[in-house]
């Protein structure tokens, strides 16, 4: 999978404004409590209006649950491969891809400087507006406009990722990792792949 730089718990990054773990009840017929967020580089969003993706499909407001918030603590357009072990993940794949890590967010080295310098805004959203769209990816959707209840500024996204117990993996190119993960038994999300460097 190529050379990699691993940024672990001994990182020099210390300060960060991290989203508090507020819990809301998600009305999907279960009693599961989740936190609902939308991460943006825009600091002043007053209301999230339903929008169509690329002008097609149903207009929706998209949000992310707390467990997969880690996948969005990077610049919006940053290509990344994210993965973790699920119920069907084999012991071999767990050891090969994760080692002792709970989850991995992998980005290209070319994006690391932008990750270090970006400022993100984590909007807390009222969960009663949302239903689950994709449990593996942590996607939630609302068909009506949603006003955030609060917003946190994440001034150091690298520290925010690490504080969630996630391994941040920096690679020269993501293609080999992406291909291997897709063929594995891991749970994964591949995000903003159109922006990935060529093979």
Question: For each predicted feature, which ranges?
Answer:
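Short, surface-exposed beta-edge/turn micro-motifs
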Residues: 32-35, 57-61, 67, 109, ...
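N-terminal cationic amphipathic segment used for targeting or macromolecule association
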Residues: 1-3, 15
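Compact, glycine/acidic-enriched structural inserts
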Residues: 67, 71-74
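Short, flexible beta-strand-to-coil junctions
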Residues: 38-44, 65, 125-130
């Amino acid at each position: 999978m190529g050379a990699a730089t691993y940024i672990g718990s001994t990182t020099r990054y210390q300060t960060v404004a991290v989203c508090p773990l507020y819990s809301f009840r998600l009305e999907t017929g279960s009693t599961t409590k989740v936190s609902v967020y939308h991460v943006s580089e825009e600091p002043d969003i007053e209301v999230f209006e339903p929008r169509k993706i690329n002008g097609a499909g149903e207009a929706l407001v998209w949000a992310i649950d707390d467990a997969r918030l880690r996948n969005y603590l990077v610049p919006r357009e940053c290509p990344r491969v994210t993965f973790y072990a699920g119920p069907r993940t084999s012991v071999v794949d767990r050891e090969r891809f994760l080692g002792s890590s709970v989850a991995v967010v992998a980005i290209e080295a070319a994006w690391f400087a932008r990750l270090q310098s970006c400022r993100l805004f984590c909007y807390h959203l009222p969960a009663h507006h949302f239903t689950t769209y994709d449990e593996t990816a942590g996607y939630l959707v609302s068909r009506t406009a949603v006003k955030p209840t609060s917003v946190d500024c994440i001034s150091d996204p690298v520290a925010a990722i690490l504080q969630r117990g996630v391994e941040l993996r920096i690679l020269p190119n993501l293609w080999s990792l992406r291909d291997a993960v897709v063929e594995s038994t891991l749970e994964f999300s591949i995000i903003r792949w159109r922006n990935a460097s060529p093979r």
